């Protein structure tokens, strides 16, 4: 349990004593709420707009244009300052809680698209469910691959994320 602005941040295993000190990679492997929220809060608490703009740059909030009823793009709130320089739509807990998925609305397909983008060396592809529609052996409609963003982050950052995710897969399968 970690106190944050009058609230308690917990990991799923808090009743068993939690994880203790973690590296960045371990924080991601274990999906530690405390670790992620502390890292993000430490680095962005004085400039939460920078954090949200960084998320926007990855395309996580992009409209995937999924042709299904009810499909909507992710909603990730940008903090706004009033004329006095105070945030009018933001609390001290907003950033740490947003960093672990609260205070946002991110459909699973957006999360999957993000992970696919990391696996695809940073190139974001529009999700598609079929490549073509055929009738009587004839192709009547095609859905070619569509690039949404050529590169969502620096190549070095993508490679580091790939390494962490590959290590997690290896760790989890042992």
Give each language-model segment a name:
Residues 1-173:
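Beta-lactam-recognizing serine transpeptidase/beta-lactamase-like catalytic domain environment
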């Amino acid at each position: 349990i970690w106190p944050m602005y009058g609230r308690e941040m917990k990991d799923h295993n808090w009743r068993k004593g939690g994880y203790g000190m973690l590296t960045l990679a371990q924080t991601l492997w274990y999906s530690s709420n405390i670790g992620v929220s502390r890292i993000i809060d430490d680095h962005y608490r004085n400039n939460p707009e920078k954090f949200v703009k960084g998320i926007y740059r990855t395309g996580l909030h992009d409209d995937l244009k999924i042709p299904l009823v009810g499909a909507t793009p992710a909603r990730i709130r940008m903090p706004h300052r009033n004329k006095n320089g105070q945030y009018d739509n933001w609390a001290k807990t907003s950033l740490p809680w947003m960093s672990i998925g609260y205070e946002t609305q991110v459909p699973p397909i957006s999360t999957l698209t993000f992970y696919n983008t990391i696996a695809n060396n940073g190139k974001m592809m529009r999700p598609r469910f079929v490549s073509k529609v055929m009738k009587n052996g004839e192709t009547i409609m095609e859905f070619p691959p569509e690039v949404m963003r050529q590169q969502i982050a620096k190549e070095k950052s993508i490679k580091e994320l790939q390494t962490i995710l590959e290590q997690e897969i290896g760790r989890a399968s042992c």
